[in-house]
Amino acid sequence: MLYWLGILIAYADRRPDKVFTLIR
C-alpha cells in the first residue's frame, strides 16, 4: 500500500483536485 501513497502524492503534485475527488 506504500506504492499507493507515492502515486497519490505524485498525482497531488500534478492535480490535487483530482486526488481529492478520488479520495472522496
From Swiss-Prot:
UniProt induction comment: Expressed in both exponential and stationary phase in rich medium; expression is higher in exponential phase (at protein level).
Any further remark recorded for this protein: This gene overlaps yriB on the same strand in another reading frame.
Protein name per Swiss-Prot or TrEMBL: Protein YriA
Organism: Escherichia coli (strain K12)
